[in-house]
A protein has these predicted regions:
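Membrane-proximal intracellular helices of multi-pass ion channels
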Residues: 1-160
């Protein structure tokens, strides 16, 4: 199994989370919403460091992975990125448990829209943007994984 190739793609999938947490930090500082700013900064550093470490681990490796490795990659990315997305929910001021914050991140990443919040209208704007960007990341990852699965599909199962 090509663990270095899987870690390369896992490292690449950490960067959209760090970019969108940076966007959320800019939004929070511009509109003076400092309520959960430290959790977004933590998410930025954790996701960027994990992305760098996974890419450093996979340096000078084969980037072409097989079909079953792609399926394992999809499972690992959905689990790991959900852990990264759940950081602002868990360390925010809403006192969510780890399970609730992980559920909120999974529902955002899979774009189902289920929530643990009683009324979403009364959340602070930065958490609403984080919630909507997690839905956006989920849609983006879904499209990327469709392309990843069906790329070189005819060459892997070629009849000779």
């Amino acid at each position: 199994m090509n663990f270095r190739g899987i870690s390369y793609y896992l490292g690449l999938s950490c960067y959209p989370v760090s970019f969108l947490s940076f966007f959320n930090i800019l939004y929070s500082s511009y509109f003076d919403h400092y309520l959960n700013l430290d959790s977004y900064i933590l998410t930025l550093f954790v996701s960027f460091l994990f992305g760098l470490s996974f890419n450093f681990f996979s340096k000078n490796s084969e980037k072409n992975i097989k079909f079953y490795e792609k399926l394992i990659l999809i499972f690992v990315v959905y689990f790991f990125i959900s852990l990264l997305i759940s950081i602002p929910y868990y360390f925010g001021n809403y006192q969510l448990s780890f399970i609730d914050s992980f559920f909120e991140a999974i529902s955002g990443l899979t774009t189902t829209g289920f929530t643990v919040f009683y009324n979403v209208k009364f959340l602070d704007p930065t958490l609403l943007i984080w919630r909507s960007t997690s839905h956006w990341i989920g849609g983006l990852f879904f499209l990327i994984f469709l392309i990843l699965i069906f790329s070189n599909f005819k060459n892997e199962y070629k009849l000779t």
